[in-house]
């Protein structure tokens, strides 16, 4: 295995973090990773929020349905996309994955919390004073893992096919 596949295969969603802060150099590096994601027509329709303040993270956690753990994470990223760009969702999801893999490469665990289709998306945008025209695509809680729970992945034969799909 090479370093990239090792990082990808070692990544797991973590919802319980140590209180240790994530360093500014790591944050800058993972933002650069996110900004280098592939994007349709080079639109780069993203805006990245870096949320270190516990009060802000707690307010966001209160707005979410499945992201209450954001309040206890030492860091959260908010990824927004320009709604007027046709492929903002695909582009911003690619950026979110790059962000998560960049964190993992630095030994920082994370958990992606959905945003785009959630009723709280507009409330988060307003809370963070993000301009109209952007919509929340994802929230990513991040930090050093306190607890890692590994769930098994589906068998490859159940999720992949070659040439054409054939029912078993």
Show the residue positions of the predicted features.
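Acidic, surface-exposed loops and disordered segments
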Residues: 1-168
